[in-house]
């Protein structure tokens, strides 16, 4: 696996990993283990927290939220808040790439502001933002 210094993780890969999705779990577990062992910094944003927690709150599954929080803490995932600078960067990104959704543009803005050298997602549409090195879960081996 390619060595990265800082990886941004989008919401879907975390859902796949934590729910042990049969199609994706093995490759994600391998990637996260490699990053952990090599000291790669893994980050995400408050958007991921919001997106992940919708289903557990809807279904009153506090165990899933506890598992999510334990994973973030145990793995040392840094969760970054959305501030005015990130909001403006996200607006600029949406202005340049109108097909990107607001949440996606915020995720991209956080990754860019935090100087991530990899963006782990399963959203191939994010590749259109060419200054971002997207790693697509479907294409991982």
What residues fall within each predicted segment?
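Conserved beta-strand segments of alpha/beta enzyme cores
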Residues: 41, 78, 133-135
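Short, well-structured N-terminal submotif of metal-dependent ribonuclease cores
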Residues: 1-44, 57-66, 70, 124, ...
């Amino acid at each position: 696996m390619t060595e990265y210094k800082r990886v941004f993780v989008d919401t879907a890969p975390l859902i796949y990993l934590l729910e042990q999705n049969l199609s994706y779990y093995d490759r994600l577990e391998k990637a996260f283990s490699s990053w952990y062992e090599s000291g790669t910094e893994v980050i995400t944003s408050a958007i991921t927290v919001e997106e992940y927690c919708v289903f557990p709150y809807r279904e009153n599954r506090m165990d899933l939220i506890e598992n999510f929080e334990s994973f973030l803490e145990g793995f040392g995932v840094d969760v970054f808040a959305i501030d005015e600078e990130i909001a403006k960067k996200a607006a600029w990104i949406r202005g340049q790439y109108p097909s990107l959704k607001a949440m996606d543009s915020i995720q991209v803005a956080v990754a860019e502001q935090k100087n991530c050298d990899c963006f782990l997602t399963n959203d191939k549409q994010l590749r259109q933002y060419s200054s971002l090195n997207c790693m697509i879960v479907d294409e991982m081996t």
